[in-house]
Every structure is written in structure tokens, then in C-alpha cells.
A protein has these predicted regions:
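N-terminal structural segment of carbohydrate-active enzymes
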Residues: 1-198, 203-207
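Intrinsic low-complexity/disordered segments
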Residues: 11, 230-233
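Active-site-proximal loop/short-helix segments
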Residues: 111-114, 199-229
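Single conserved hydrophobic/aromatic residue that forms the stacking wall/gate
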Residues: 232-243
């Protein structure tokens, strides 16, 4: 019999911060706007607020390309305002969840910048960097956003990095224990700030086919959708270890 968790039988409400409530007139929703609506949301019967990404980001994919997991993007407010939101929610017996986007980061993240400067160095192992096939991508996988999942590394004729989504969203290498530990540290840090938990984004994509085998093409571009690999590997023990 499954033990009852605190979130069972709770009402959750997703907030997309950009379009929720603007308090400073710049046309972009912000953290003070969320705070201002807590009483209203409580009156509606909401217990849990799941907030889409507000981390620092170049916003190539609406915040799902994170350049700093420890910072709030200035368009939404400050870290002090985030802490105030958590505090005000707790006063009302409400819980704050944030999106946890760790299948990939932003190409502007410090780790990736260091990886591009030295693909064979320590930070290169934080990502999936592979040699191509005579200058062509290592596999025929298609990204969720179209085109190859592989992008050639500037300055190299035959080295590529993998991105399941946009090229500005390089996939993190979950086979690397150091990467896992750094992400776990980040999760613990946010919990220490008072966050109640996370909604995990794109979790089905973190396990890769390490044989790097081509798939049967499913379109005229000669590529095959990368999500098919996620369906194949969705139950593998290493994926469950991460969760």
C-alpha cells in the first residue's frame, strides 16, 4: 500500500509568470504580482503553486534554457522577492514548486562555456560530446524542435554536442556522477530556501542510447525523432535512480 504524501489530495495551480501579473508596468509578469494574488488563489482552493521557470535565462525557450540555477532572472524580480513569495505562501499554508529543468541547461551556462573552450577537458564531460562521421553528425536523431540533435562545436571539424531541444539547450550528461552531485546540491540549496519541491521537466529524456546507433528514418530529412529513444529507455534503472 502506498504511503500518503503531503501533496496527495492537494489542488495545484500552474503559474506561467510572464503572463500572470505585472506590477511594474513593463508588460511582463513578476514575483510581486504572484504575491499580490496569493489571497485570491487561496480563496479559489489552491494549495500548491507550480511556477514555470524564473531562473536566470537568455529566454530562447521561455526560461527552459537556464544559465544560472541559483539566480532569479531580473525580468521577474530578485532572490529576496522569491524568498518573500515562499514566506507569504507558507503563511497561507500554500506550497511553492518550481520547474526543475535538468535534462539540459543553457548554452550560456558557465559549464557549457568552459566545455566549448576545451571539449576534451573536465567540463566537456558534463555534456554529450562526440566525434562525427567524416564531418557529419554522429547519429541521425532529430530534435524535438526539428533538425539534428547534434550541433558542430565551433573551431572543430568533427566534434559535435547533443541537444534534444534547441541548439542553445545542450543536454547534460547524467552518466557523469559529478554532474549528478552538482544538480543534487542545487536541489538541496533551493529546499534550504524554503521551496516545497519541484516539478521535473523532460525527465524521460535524461537516459540516452549510449550505443549511439542510428534509428530507422521516419521522414524525408533522413532523421528519426529522438523521443523514440526516450520511450525505449523510459524504464531503465539508471533513470529511476535519478528520480
Amino acid at each position: 500500500m502506498m504511503n500518503k504524501k503531503w501533496w496527495h489530495n492537494k489542488v495545484a495551480y500552474q503559474i506561467y509568470p510572464k503572463s500572470f501579473k505585472d506590477t511594474n508596468g513593463d508588460g511582463i509578469g513578476d514575483i510581486p504580482g504572484i504575491i499580490s494574488k496569493l489571497d485570491y488563489l487561496k480563496d479559489l482552493g489552491v494549495d500548491i503553486l507550480w511556477i514555470s521557470p524564473m531562473y536566470q535565462s537568455p529566454m530562447v525557450d521561455n526560461g527552459y534554457d537556464i544559465s544560472d540555477y541559483y539566480a532569479i532572472d531580473p525580468m521577474f524580480g530578485s532572490m529576496d522577492e522569491m524568498k518573500q513569495l515562499i514566506k507569504e505562501a507558507k503563511k497561507r499554508n500554500m506550497y511553492i514548486l518550481m520547474d526543475l529543468v535538468v535534462n539540459h541547461c543553457s548554452s550560456e551556462h558557465e559549464w557549457f562555456q568552459k566545455a566549448m573552450a576545451d571539449p576534451e577537458g573536465e567540463y566537456g564531460s558534463y555534456f554529450y560530446i562526440k566525434d562525427g562521421k567524416d564531418g557529419q553528425p554522429p547519429t541521425n536523431w532529430r530534435s524535438y524542435f526539428g533538425g539534428s540533435v547534434w550541433e558542430k562545436i565551433p573551431g572543430y571539424d568533427n566534434k559535435f554536442y547533443l541537444h534534444s531541444f534547441a541548439k542553445e539547450q545542450p543536454d547534460l550528461n547524467w552518466e557523469n556522477e559529478i554532474v549528478r552531485e552538482k544538480i543534487y546540491e542545487m536541489i538541496c540549496w533551493w529546499m534550504d530556501q524554503g521551496l516545497s519541491g519541484f516539478r521535473i521537466d523532460a525527465i524521460m529524456n535524461i537516459k540516452k542510447d549510449l550505443t549511439w546507433s542510428d534509428l530507422k528514418p521516419d521522414g524525408p530529412d533522413g532523421l528519426a525523432d529522438v523521443y523514440k529513444l526516450s520511450l525505449i529507455h523510459i524504464s531503465e534503472p539508471t533513470r529511476l535512480d535519478v528520480i
